[in-house]
Structures are given as C-alpha cells and as structure tokens.
C-alpha cells in the first residue's frame, strides 16, 4: 500500500461515524446515570417510610426499568447511535435528576422532614397520575384548545396591527398612541370585566389569551416593518415593483424574524394568562385542575399537574422554534431555545 493510500485510509477512519461512536462509548457517563437511577430505586423501596404511601413499589420498579433501559442503550449503542448520543450528552443531567428525586423521597417519605400532605413524596404524584389520568387528560386538552385558539387570534390581530402600523403612516397615526397607552396593561387586570361581558368562560378566556398575545406581536411586527432598509424598496421599485409586491415580497419576509421573537415573548404571557383565567373563571383546563386540587388538599395531584404544565408548555415553545427554524431557513442568530 502506498503512503498516499495509507493516509487516505486513516483519514477515512478518523471521520467515520462508527469510529466516533466507539470513541464516545469509551466514556461511561450513561452507566453512571443507570447506576444513579438503580440506587434511587433501592432507596425508594428498601428504606422504610415514616407512614404508608401507595405506589412505593411501583415507583421503585419504574426507576429500575429506566435504569435498565439506559444500560440497554449503552450496550446496543451501535444500533441505537442517535438515541445513545442524545442520552450520553444528557447523562449527567439524568444523574442529577435521580439525585434530586432521591432527596425528595428521603425528605418527604423516609425522614418526614417535609410536612404531609403538603409535600407528598414522588409516589404520591405517581398515584395521582394513575388514579386521575382521565381528568388530567381532559384538562390538558381543554388548556391546549384554549391556548392555541387564543394565541392564534392574538397573533393574527397583532400581525395585522403591526404590519399596518409600520407600513402606513396614516394608520400608525392612530394605532401608535393606542399601543403605547393600552398595550402595557396586563390582560389579567381585565378578568372581572371580561367574565361579566363575555357570554361564556371559554370566549372570555380566549379573549384574554389573545389580548396577551396581541401586544408583543404587534410591537415586534411594527418594529420589523419599520427597520427594513429603504434600499430594498428602491431596488424593487427600480425593477417596476408595485406597492402590493413591496408589501408581500419585501416587507413581510423581512419582518418574519421579528414576528417570531414577538410570538416567543407573547407565548409566555399567554400561558400565564391562560392559567390565571382557568383558575378564576374557566371551568376546565390545567389552571382549573390546580385550583380543584388545592381546594381538596390533593397535593399529589397539584404537583403532578405542575410537572405536566412544565413539560407541556415547554413542548409548545419548542414547537414554535421548530416552526421558526423551518420558515427562516438559513437565518442564524436571534432568540435561542
């Protein structure tokens, strides 16, 4: 074999995905994560509880199953390369999660440091999921319907408001003072009026969510239209473009990055308004579920709903950024998630 062929073979081996996976598998972080979850399961089952808690054995079994799955992924890392890379990258986070779960377990169920029933152990949350999954699933469905309906209306209204404000000085003459005066008013401040004016709690909640979405989307869209370089319009006009073309092909595409920033900012406010509206007036959804759980001192259900909300709304935000990355292909920078 010539020197050139040998160098080419070595270079190919260095960039081979199989070689990279083998090098990566030399690090035992995933084994550490599996061990942490296995030990956490031992603590859950073998350390006596200060009182009787249902689902203790079930929780320990689930922890051991998860530990076994981590080991399976590590052993079959060649066949599960994509999953292995993701879990390997998050291995220390999984270790930290197992440690936090054990601390929660010990402080609440094993030593009784946290008063019951206000701070139930993890198996209390698991018991709530198993016993009340139907009500919880209905609450998730109701919250998502209200959220997407309200955010959709608010985003459309905000986009049209911001676009017309930035594009037309005549429109901006009237809308800018309105935005500056009423936009910063919290949507939750209008709950007493909304619950009286609107015929149903759903329509009132949708209006509040839409209102919380409208202001940031309108302001960011207005900013995006106003910040478009005038030279873009000049070049298009030189080529014979009409006002309609300038709006649809120049102004709106240039505004899209600002629009998605506005949607990101609006989503957080819309979620907050959604939960408050459900707790105070809307007779369905996760906010209503939280209020119900607190009223009946079902704190396992309450913490379970909080965990679901964290995962669910984080997923909704991730979906927004997934759409943004598909729409704004090739554009780097901006808000990261």
Could you say what each language-model-derived stretch is?
Residues 226, 257, 261, 303-337:
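C-terminal transmembrane helix and the adjacent membrane-cytosol boundary/short C-terminal tail
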């Amino acid at each position: 074999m010539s020197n050139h062929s040998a160098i080419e073979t070595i270079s190919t081996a260095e960039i081979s995905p199989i070689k990279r996976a083998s090098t990566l598998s030399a690090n035992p972080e995933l084994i550490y994560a599996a061990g942490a979850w296995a030990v956490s399961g031992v603590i859950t089952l073998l350390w006596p509880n200060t009182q009787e808690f249902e689902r203790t054995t079930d929780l320990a079994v689930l922890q051991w199953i998860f530990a076994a799955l981590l080991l399976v992924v590590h052993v079959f890392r060649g066949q599960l390369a994509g999953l292995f890379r993701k879990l390997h990258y998050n291995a220390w986070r999984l270790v930290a999660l197992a440690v936090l779960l054990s601390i929660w377990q010990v402080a609440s169920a094993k030593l009784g440091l946290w008063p019951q029933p206000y701070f139930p152990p993890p198996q209390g949350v698991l018991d709530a999921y198993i016993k009340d999954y139907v009500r919880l699933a209905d609450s998730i469905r109701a919250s998502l319907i209200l959220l997407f309906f309200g955010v959709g209306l608010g985003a459309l209204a905000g986009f049209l408001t911001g676009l017309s404000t930035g594009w037309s000085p005549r429109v901006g003459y009237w809308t800018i003072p309105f935005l500056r005066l009423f936009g910063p008013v919290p949507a939750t401040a209008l709950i007493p009026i909304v619950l009286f004016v609107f015929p149903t709690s759903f329509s009132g909640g949708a209006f509040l969510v839409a209102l919380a979405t409208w202001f940031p989307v309108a302001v960011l869209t207005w900013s995006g239209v106003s910040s478009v370089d005038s030279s873009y319009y000049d070049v298009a006009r030189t080529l014979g473009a009409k006002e309609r073309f300038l709006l649809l092909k120049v102004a709106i595409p240039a505004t899209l990055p600002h629009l998605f920033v506005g949607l990101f900012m609006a989503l957080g406010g819309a979620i907050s308004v959604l939960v408050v509206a459900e707790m105070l007036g809307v007779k369905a959804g996760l906010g209503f579920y939280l209020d119900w759980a607190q009223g009946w001192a079902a704190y396992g259900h309450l913490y379970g709903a909080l965990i679901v909300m964290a995962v669910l709304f984080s997923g909704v935000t991730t979906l927004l950024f997934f759409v943004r990355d598909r729409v704004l292909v090739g554009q780097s920078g901006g808000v990261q998630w």
